[in-house]
């Protein structure tokens, strides 16, 4: 089973830059998007053979998530069920026979960490939400988690120590998530692989110089460890400031 996650930084812009070619070529079983930057009714996307689920932010041109899946899910849920967290279209949960699929666009802590306090609350509520799902069946989480977990996960750890996405607080929350029974799938397969990133700033030729951050993830319940086959980061794919990340699962194991 092939799963892909991509922060497209605006799906309409990504379509103009070859999104559909990549989508069709990959033929994923489940394809998740973050930062769609759409309002309802703005885009009619024909994806033959896929069921589409979109969660929109109330604010125009902001945030938003989507999941395209070949198999129809048993249930669909938008958001966490907490009003203060559900206005920005950040979470979609699909239930399948053997697992839950959750895509998430984690709130950015912003310049000067203006939103760090909100981010900390979000992290705790989101982890609680995942652990509740896990009582029923294992969970696959994917998306832009807006944190580089360890120094290996970004090009310039020293100079970014207090910047959004690499604060001790954000990294600590990701550690808490893993400690609560989840696996960072890319590091599971490639614990020491350096200079593989999923996001590059548009400033200062960052992508050209590979001055990136690995902030896009597939994280799975430990109960799915035996089903993990491989993880990939498609750094060659352009069209956004992020690149797609991929997980292969064998659910028949």
What are these regions (language model features)?
Residues 1-47, 57, 62-63, 149, ...:
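N-terminal, active-site-proximal structural segment of metallo-dependent hydrolase catalytic domains
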Residues 1-9, 98-110, 142:
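Active-site-proximal beta-strand elements of phosphoester/diester hydrolases
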Residues 7, 23-41, 101, 130-151, ...:
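Active-site beta-strand/loop signature of hydrolases that rely on acidic residues for catalysis
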Residues 37, 42-109:
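Structured beta-strand-rich core segments of catalytic domains in phosphoester-bond hydrolases
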Residues 51, 125-211, 215:
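Metal-dependent phosphoesterases centered on the DNase I-like endonuclease/exonuclease/phosphatase
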Residues 60-75, 196, 203-226:
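Conserved beta strand-loop-helix elements of the APE1-like EEP
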Residues 81-82, 107-123, 158-162:
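Surface-exposed cleft-lining segments at the edges of enzyme active sites
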Residues 232-253:
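Surface polyanion/phosphate-binding segment centered on an Asp-His-Pro turn
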């Amino acid at each position: 089973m092939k799963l892909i996650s991509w922060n497209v930084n605006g799906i309409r812009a990504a379509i103009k830059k070859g999104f559909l070619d990549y989508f069709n070529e990959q033929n994923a079983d489940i394809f998740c998007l973050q930062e769609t930057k759409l309002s309802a009714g703005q885009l009619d996307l024909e994806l033959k053979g896929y069921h589409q689920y979109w969660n929109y932010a109330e604010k125009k041109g902001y945030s938003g998530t989507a999941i395209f899946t070949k198999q129809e899910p048993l249930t669909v849920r938008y958001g966490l069920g907490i009003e203060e967290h559900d206005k920005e279209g950040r979470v979609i949960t699909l239930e399948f026979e053997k697992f839950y699929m959750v895509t998430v666009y984690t709130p950015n802590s912003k310049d000067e960490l203006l939103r760090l306090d909100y981010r900390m609350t979000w992290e705790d509520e989101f982890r609680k939400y995942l652990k509740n799902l896990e009582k029923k069946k294992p969970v696959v989480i994917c998306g832009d988690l807006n944190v580089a977990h360890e120094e290996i996960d970004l090009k310039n750890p020293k100079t970014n120590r207090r910047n959004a996405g690499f604060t001790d607080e954000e990294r600590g929350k990701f550690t808490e998530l893993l400690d609560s029974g989840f696996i960072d799938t890319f590091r599971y397969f490639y614990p020491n692989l350096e200079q593989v990133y999923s996001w590059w700033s548009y400033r200062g030729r960052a992508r050209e110089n590979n001055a990136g951050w690995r902030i896009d993830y597939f994280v799975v319940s430990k109960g799915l460890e035996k089903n993990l086959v491989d993880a990939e980061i498609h750094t060659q794919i352009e069209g956004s400031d992020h690149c797609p990340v991929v997980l292969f699962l064998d659910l028949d194991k």
